[in-house]
Amino acid sequence: MNIELLQQLCEASAVSGDEQEVRDILINTLEPCVNEITFDGLGSFVARKGNKGPKVAVVGHMDEVGFMVTHIDESGFLRFTTIGGWWNQSMLNHRVTIRTHKGFKIPGVIGSVAPHALTEKQKQQPLSFDEMFIDIGANSRDEVEKRGVAMGDFISPEANFACWGEDKVVGKALDNRIGCAMMAELLQTVNNPEITLYGVGSVEEEVGLRGAQTSAEHIKPDVVIVLDTAVAGDVPGIDNIKYPLKPGQGPGLMLFDKRYFPNQKLVAAFKNCATQNDLPLQFSTMKTGATDGGRYNVMGGGRPVVALCLPTRYLHANSGMISKADYDALLTLIRGFLTTLTAEKVNAFSQFRQVD
């Protein structure tokens, strides 16, 4: 794990629709080691390494869930809307960062009412999104505007990256900066002249997998590996039958989500690669969410796709948590798969005639 790169990516502000900070980091990281960097029309980052053989894409979405300023009242408080999926009980009194239209960072906090001022009934009722506000310490609308904050500015949770103990990494936007970091590490270290390797940082995954569709059309890949996070079911309050993944017990292979089924030959290939290299591999399903695989697998008549994920505690909140060991195992697994890939193997993934 390149912990410095992951920290840099996690501390960037890059809410869906405003991914520039992560895009810049990926450009600076990968420009020295790839043949070409291009972008699709929505802004997805596409790095190409090699120029012959089948096109193999490794995809990690750049965007994170966050908010947008929708109103500034006369007292200087900001109203906002959510971008991506949030649970209102995970938001109150958390610090946030407003990225102004000029790129400046303004700190704020999602305000909460002191318990002394709440009735017993109010204490039992969660606050709706529409009732929430952000306080940046301003005393008026004019003061807010002088700081450069305006309607339409994007808001992300405050950066809080840390390593806890020997194995855990904590921070905002691990969904899906771990995918971006791993994609970059693979582009830096995999050298296989049999394939053309693409690293993709897609945009707007959290609001509808939009960059997956546009980047798929841009590249037209032959095989796609999607990197993402998945719910860890090892904490109190989560059904560990529906969510069986546990941090520290290996990465996960997504068997299906709301928009995707993996190519079964790809699944078998990764199972075999994990066994041969003595790497742990868990399995997961997701009925209520989707990954970029849901767009890549239906583009251009259909493509072989597999989604691989890291078990993550506290997704779509201010602080997620992953295992370093899981990250390293997944990196080793995919590197081993890509290093031994040939045109013949890639072609076989799309052969569906039963052979006697």
Task: Outline where the language-model segments fall.
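N-terminal hydrophobic/helix-forming segments and targeting peptides
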Residues: 1-356
